[in-house]
């Protein structure tokens, strides 16, 4: 028999649900029209015509994560073959191959400066490498191994060359000072695994997505969220800050992508593929914010017009589920990686 729930917890859960319902009712009152209605007189966007420009072959196991450097040319990928590969996406060449101590990598991050990369996963730590210095074996030198997590490392992003922010399966967010090798802050962020982090362009704020189905907006200096967003009916697998700085996009296990707005404090866009069969693992936005792109379990990258909500087609080519996509900072290319062991650069 399952254990009986404490009556106090039951009462608190009911109170919480009532408050959430009340918030949603207030939001509905404030929403005088939908984004689609407001944009109905806008012209349709042209169909996205991009194809695989570079096919990056080098990993020999599932590739779990990809992230661009600030130069929009180099990207890093992490795979279950126990390697990080730094790619030149313009030529398709490998720049560096970094062997990892643990093959169970789930997230990678490239510093905007191009000097450092970080990774982490089932080893419950975040490892930072200096790409400009080599160890005795000739591999990129380990700068820091950031330990102390009680769950897997699911997401990491550089604030600058000396600070990194991480999200993990122990529900926490940590900010680290890389020079000191110490946490500058650590706090419980969600009621479930913190799965995804996306930074604003100025690095002052960030958005998180979680298994608890919520997304939160944070100030890097504070340990309490500025705003919490509800709406998804399953894990939020990916969040992506809107280029305008006024909102963010999400991709979820509930087979939908959504657009949230900070100013109206609620969801303003809802996007579904033509055949709603697979969840979304990752999302990205075009530089203008007009297109939202989502990598899916159905091996495709789906595209929508964010304003009018129309499905704009899909990028196909991968032969297994897409695990991660990343838009180049200049908006000129999209990188994607998959369980098919390959990385593609779309232009």
Model-derived segments and spans:
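Intrinsically disordered, low-complexity acidic/Ser/Thr/Pro-rich linker and tail segments
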Residues: 1-61
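Domain-scale macromolecular recognition modules
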Residues: 43-107, 116, 128, 172
């Amino acid at each position: 028999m399952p254990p009986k729930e404490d009556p106090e917890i039951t009462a608190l859960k009911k109170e919480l649900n009532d408050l959430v319902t009340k918030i949603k009712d207030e939001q509905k009152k404030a929403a005088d029209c939908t984004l689609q209605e407001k944009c109905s007189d806008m012209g349709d966007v042209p169909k996205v015509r991009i194809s695989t420009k570079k096919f990056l072959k080098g990993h020999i196991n599932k590739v779990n994560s990809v992230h661009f450097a600030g130069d929009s040319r180099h990207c890093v990928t992490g795979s279950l073959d126990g390697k990080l590969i730094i790619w030149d996406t313009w030529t398709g060449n490998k720049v560096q191959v970094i062997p990892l101590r643990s093959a169970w990598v789930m997230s990678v991050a490239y510093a905007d400066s191009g000097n450092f990369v970080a990774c982490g996963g089932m080893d419950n730590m975040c490892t930072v490498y200096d790409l400009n210095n080599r160890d005795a074996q000739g591999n990129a030198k380990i700068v820091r191994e950031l330990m102390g997590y009680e769950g897997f490392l699911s997401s990491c992003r550089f604030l600058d060359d000396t600070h990194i922010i991480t999200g993990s399966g122990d529900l926490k967010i940590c900010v680290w000072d890389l020079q000191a090798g110490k946490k500058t802050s650590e706090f419980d962020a969600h009621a479930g695994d913190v799965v995804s982090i996306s930074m604003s362009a100025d690095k002052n704020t960030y958005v998180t997505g979680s298994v608890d189905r919520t997304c939160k907006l944070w100030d890097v200096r504070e340990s309490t969220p500025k705003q919490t967003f509800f709406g998804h009916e399953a894990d939020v697998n990916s969040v992506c800050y809107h280029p305008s700085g006024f909102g963010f996009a999400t991709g979820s296990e509930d087979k939908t992508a959504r657009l949230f707005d900070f100013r109206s404090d609620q969801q303003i866009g809802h996007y579904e593929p033509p055949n709603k069969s697979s969840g979304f693992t990752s999302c990205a936005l075009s530089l203008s914010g007009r297109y939202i792109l989502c990598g899916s379990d159905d091996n495709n990258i789906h595209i929508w017009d964010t304003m009018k909500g129309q499905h704009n087609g899909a990028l196909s080519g991968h032969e297994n589920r897409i695990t991660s996509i990343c838009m180049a900072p200049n908006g000129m290319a999209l990188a994607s990686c998959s369980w098919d062991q390959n990385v593609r650069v779309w232009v």
